[in-house]
Each structure stands twice: as C-alpha cells, then as structure tokens.
C-alpha cells in the first residue's frame, strides 16, 4: 500500500524516527511531505533531515506559514497525482484548511484519507473552520486521536467514523537514554560555559515554548523558594523570554537561571541527562489544555525524573513515574522540588520508573506499529 503523510511537525528531526520505523513494516511504500520550515510565536524552525532511511521525504511550500488554521500546500494536488497513494494521512486537526484541502484532494484521486487530532476541549469554531471540520468528518476513512479526551470531543461534534488513540510521536529509547557511567563522569568534570548550569548544583530543567500557558513564570517563583545550591536551565524560545529574564532579576535568582535558547532535536538526548529533574508547569487556558507533554517522555526515556502540573493529559502520561502538583500551586511545586533535591535515591527510583513506562508505552516503534495497523484496516476496507 502506498501511503503519503503530510506533516509540518516532521520538520523536527527526532520525529522522523517514527517514519523510519513505519517504513520497516511489511507492505508499505511511504512518502512524507513536509514544509521547508515552520514558524510560529515560539520561533522559526527549519527542516532537519535527521532520520530519512527507508522512505521518501519531500518538501512542499506552504501558504500562510505559521497559521495553524489557515496554512495549506498549494502543490499538494500535483504531488498526489504523481505519487498515486492508496492512503493520505493528513497529520492535521480536522478544523484547519490544510486538512480540508488534503482530504478533498485525496477524494478526487481515489485515495482513502485520515486526520489526526489532539483537541481535548469541546471548542466550537466559526465558519469556515466549522465547515472544514464537518466536511473532514464525512470524508475521512478513520481518525487518530492523541489522547482519550479527544475521542469524546470528536463524538460530541458529530464524528461517527472509526477512531484510535495513538500519540502523534514517541521516542527512540536508543537515542533518548540514560547517560552511561563514562558519560556521567565526563559531564561531571566539565566546567560550565556561558549560560550553562554548573554540574555541581541540583539542576532543574524546563524544555518547551516560552509562552504563558507553559507556566515558566510559576517555575521561576517555585525555584526562588529553594534552599541550597541549585540552577535552572530553560531550553526553548518564545515571546515570553524577555519578561521571564526580567522576572528572574526581580526575584534575585538571575545568576542561577540559564536561558539556553532553541537547540536542534538531535542535541536533546545529550542535554536531558545533565538535569536532576525536568518540570512541566503548564496552566490551562479557556481555549487550551495540555494535550500530551512530549518533553516528559523524552526526559523519562533518559532516566530523568519529572514533575508536572496536574492538568490535561499530563497525569496520564506520567502515571506513577513522576510527581504531580496542583495546577498553579507554586508552593506545591517548591515542595516537590525540595523533596527530590534532598533525596537522590528517590530521583533514581523515579528515573527508572519513567524509562520503564516509556519502554512499555511510548516508543517510536510501538507508535509506528499501531499506526501501521490503522493503515492496514483502512486499506482492507477501501
């Protein structure tokens, strides 16, 4: 079966491992179509061709790059006519233009199609997005939901077709792995350079966008309440960076807070093991709640303990392999950090649990196999 996947998320090199795993499976000829870059309020990300073995990775220009709702690929029709897929996998929400455009083109060329959704809030969209959504519900042979709550949203809005819960991407446990003893020794002997945290401190890490809903301001307040020697590494970019740096100055902790900026996904497996804990302090918004928290499974795969806000899908991702605090509770987060800073054996235990949970649920190979099963079901029916 010939499958074409269209995904702006695949500009991230680490995410391409899922496609390498898919391409290994029997009976599939896989092509991915991605934009040369994607930019939004968190910054500009160019395509990183990191994992491209076994399938074809094509680029296609976007119109309205950076607009989640309105972007689309004007040359997609020509590409589909050349590739003649049996299945078109639009890795997009059903309410956006790219998904509607892709599913319409798939219907015209006789291909079955499916979409992906993270949407775990029952939002109502104005026209034309409500029109796109309902049209895609009718055209799609299947849907993939990133979490269980997204299925309930689909059903409440009228989707009656088959749907399966599969996270969008997993992690490769051979790449995201704990540091070896030799690597830990090397890291411990390194001198901090520039804005890198000292290896002698209890190191708290955050990875993700610097946007209000990610709650990095809460993390700064929580860290300001810590005693002893500690440092905070903030990995990522976004419009809040200046405000967060100013907040660190006001709190008197600027010397312990290190803004690392954006790093390629290929560097993350070497960064996470340097941290003693990763924190995801997200806060809900009327139009958004955490849908998965991918950085959690990346850190867990590296044997790094995690702390997250009790919001959205985060408790289901962590299970019993990390600590939770009530959303917005600075004191609760400070207490969780203090407990881990004082107890190395507890950190090691949570790190082991986290990696075991990833190996059981969230590897790229497992997610690729589940996705392949969906493709086979569609192919048999159509």
Residue positions per predicted region:
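Donor nucleotide-sugar binding/catalytic pocket of nucleotide-sugar-dependent glycosyltransferases
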Residues: 134-185, 259
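Acidic donor-binding loop of glycosyltransferase active sites
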Residues: 256, 273-289, 304
């Amino acid at each position: 079966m010939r499958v074409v996947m269209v995904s702006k998320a695949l500009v991230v090199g680490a995410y391409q491992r899922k496609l390498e795993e898919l391409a290994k499976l029997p009976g599939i000829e896989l092509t991915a179509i991605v934009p040369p870059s994607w930019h939004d309020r968190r910054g500009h990300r160019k395509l990183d061709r990191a994992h491209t073995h076994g399938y074809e990775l094509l680029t296609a220009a976007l119109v309205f790059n950076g607009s989640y709702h309105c972007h689309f690929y004007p040359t997609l029709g020509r590409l589909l006519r050349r590739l003649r897929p049996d299945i078109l996998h639009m890795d997009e929400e059903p309410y956006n233009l790219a998904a509607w455009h892709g599913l319409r083109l798939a219907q015209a060329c006789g291909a079955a199609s499916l979409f992906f959704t993270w949407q775990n809030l029952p939002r109502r969209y104005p026209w034309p997005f409500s029109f796109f959504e309902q049209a895609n519900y009718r055209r799609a042979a299947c849907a993939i939901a990133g979490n269980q709550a997204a299925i309930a949203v689909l059903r409440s809005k009228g989707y009656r077709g088959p749907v399966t819960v599969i996270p969008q991407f997993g992690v490769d446990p051979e790449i995201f792995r704990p540091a070896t003893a030799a690597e830990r020794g090397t890291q411990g002997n390194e001198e901090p350079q520039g804005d890198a945290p000292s290896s002698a401190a209890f190191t708290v890490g955050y990875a993700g966008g610097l946007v209000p809903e990610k709650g990095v301001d809460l993390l700064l307040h929580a860290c300001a309440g810590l005693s002893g020697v500690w440092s905070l590494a903030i990995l990522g970019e976004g419009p809040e960076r200046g405000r967060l740096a100013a907040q660190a100055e006001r709190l008197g902790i600027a010397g312990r807070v290190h803004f690392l900026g954006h790093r390629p996904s290929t560097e993350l497996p070497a960064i996470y093991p340097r941290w003693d804990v990763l924190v995801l302090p997200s806060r809900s918004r009327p139009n958004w709640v955490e849908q998965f928290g991918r950085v959690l499974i990346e850190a867990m795969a590296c044997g790094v303990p995690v702390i997250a806000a009790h919001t959205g899908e985060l408790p289901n991702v962590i299970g019993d392999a990390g600590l939770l605090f009530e959303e917005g509770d600075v004191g609760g987060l400070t207490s969780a950090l203090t407990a881990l800073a004082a107890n190395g054996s507890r950190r090691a235990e949570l790190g082991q649990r986290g990696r075991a949970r990833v190996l059981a649920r969230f590897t790229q190979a497992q997610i690729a196999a589940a996705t392949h099963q969906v493709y086979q079901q569609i192919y048999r029916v159509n």
